[in-house]
Amino acid sequence: MGAAAKLAFAVFLISCSSGAILGRSETQECLFFNANWERDRTNQTGVEPCYGDKDKRRHCFATWKNISGSIEIVKQGCWLDDINCYDRTDCIEKKDSPEVYFCCCEGNMCNEKFSYFPEMEVTQPTSNPVTPKPPYYNILLYSLVPLMLIAGIVICAFWVYRHHKMAYPPVLVPTQDPGPPPPSPLLGLKPLQLLEVKARGRFGCVWKAQLLNEYVAVKIFPIQDKQSWQNEYEVYSLPGMKHENILQFIGAEKRGTSVDVDLWLITAFHEKGSLSDFLKANVVSWNELCHIAETMARGLAYLHEDIPGLKDGHKPAISHRDIKSKNVLLKNNLTACIADFGLALKFEAGKSAGDTHGQVGTRRYMAPEVLEGAINFQRDAFLRIDMYAMGLVLWELASRCTAADGPVDEYMLPFEEEIGQHPSLEDMQEVVVHKKKRPVLRDYWQKHAGMAMLCETIEECWDHDAEARLSAGCVGERITQMQRLTNIITTEDIVTVVTMVTNVDFPPKESSL
């Protein structure tokens, strides 16, 4: 075969391969089914059109379980741009005995039929008789195979480069490799599918994602914020960190190469979002305020507590260092849970607390001693800083409560009325340290027995004297008593109770531990 003929044939092969790899239908439909359609408020079954970016491929998928020989479908629908699904016309699960079966394919309604064919190890026969081949067969084989391999490698390399460039923004080259991903309960399970960005913060963004038939939250850190990701993972991995009022941790993973790398933290997903977002759109009743405040206080009290002798080890006391309404999440029943441990400090016996740089956190929630740079670097000092911030979060709740006989304010952040939405460190020092101002407690709040008690508790949380502040456990007990007391008070009793508010038998005032 002449050189010109070989070149022409190679060009033909490349064009054919490009068409096979890059060519695909602009529209695709998949069979849709959702076993949890009532909970998710979707149709149970139907046909789902697949949408997505033009440069992304669209697939269909199916997940099912085999329960004692009975097939139970979990979900069917569209699946977006997964390399494991490329050029599969049939929906076939090949992994050996998975807990949940999963397959994906390309083509309209290709997930209507699905099957399970585990890959079997093929044994080589002891003898393999060679059949004679014509002499020109070897010439074609040795000529075409290298050309096809080269063409395939070039096309695949171009596609991977183009796809990767669009999928990931450029990041700085790290001075240190973050090392292998930590052990994760997610390893070995089906891949996550990112659905939508729910929040953006200082250390990355939070996605709503789907893991098989449940939603999870994925917090994605760029490599520059490796320290925050590592710290949060280490705190979640401490003994005793499973608690109703602390965000449930699922796993941590590293995605990408050593240069283009993202660090993932996977947790439970709560549709109501943060307390801040909830208060922007909703007012709360007295009972709702008490439930949110009590569960938030119990979560912080558990975080602050040093608990030896647990089954999985010793839980140290932990200071959050960034308590704010954005870092308190609400479950569907308005139970609060504490989130975001990127700045948290753990206090283990005989060990340094690590980087104890004082001025960290969100400016408007910084305690006076933090703003002054006059922190006593002891455990209790850090716990009292958390309690100052908790007082501000309680004020946010009070400002949106309907219990008092008066207007409910529009939602505002602490000190937003005094300083605005973007205070500088100097602004906060002037207002909080020098003028000793705090957010306004409305006069008409005092006319409601429970709100009057809450105002007193708030003032004791944000006291200028750190050692005079309440502990989180004490706040939780007080709120329980407030709710119990106000639920048995009649309208005629309110005036009497308000005059006696300072004599209520509250739990004894105590410091942060």
UniProtKB/Swiss-Prot annotation:
Tissue expression profile of the protein: Brain, testis, intestine, liver and kidney.
Biological processes per GO annotation: anterior/posterior pattern specification; BMP signaling pathway; determination of left/right symmetry; embryonic skeletal system development; gastrulation with mouth forming second; male gonad development; mesoderm development; odontogenesis of dentin-containing tooth
Residue ranges, Extracellular side: 20-135
Residues of the active site: D322 (proton acceptor)
Domain Protein kinase: 192-485
Disulfide-bonded cysteines: C30-C60, C50-C78, C85-C104, C91-C103, C105-C110
Catalyses which reaction(s): L-threonyl-[receptor-protein] + ATP = O-phospho-L-threonyl-[receptor-protein] + ADP + H(+); L-seryl-[receptor-protein] + ATP = O-phospho-L-seryl-[receptor-protein] + ADP + H(+)
Record-linked InterPro entries: Activin_recp, Kinase-like_dom_sf, Prot_kinase_dom, Ser/Thr_kinase_AS, Snake_toxin-like_sf, TGFB_receptor
One Pfam assignment: Activin_recp
Necessary cofactors: Mg(2+); Mn(2+)
Domain of life: Eukaryota
Residues annotated for ATP binding in this entry: K198, A199, R200, G201, R202, F203, G204, C205, V206, K219
Main EC class the enzyme belongs to: transferase
Annotated compartments: Cell membrane
E.C. designation(s): 2.7.11.30
Glycosylation sites: N43, N66
Signal peptide: 1-19
Membrane-traversing stretches: 136-161
SMART domains referenced in this protein's UniProt entry, alphabetically: S_TKc
Membrane-protein topology: Single-pass type I membrane protein
Main location (coarse class): membrane
Family statement drawn from the similarity comment of this UniProt entry: Belongs to the protein kinase superfamily. TKL Ser/Thr protein kinase family. TGFB receptor subfamily.
Role according to the record: On ligand binding, forms a receptor complex consisting of two type II and two type I transmembrane serine/threonine kinases. Type II receptors phosphorylate and activate type I receptors which autophosphorylate, then bind and activate SMAD transcriptional regulators. Receptor for activin A, activin B and inhibin A. Mediates induction of adipogenesis by GDF6.
Name of the protein in its database record: Activin receptor type-2A
Organism whose genome encodes this protein: Mus musculus
Organism placement in taxonomy: Eukaryota, Metazoa, Chordata, Craniata, Vertebrata
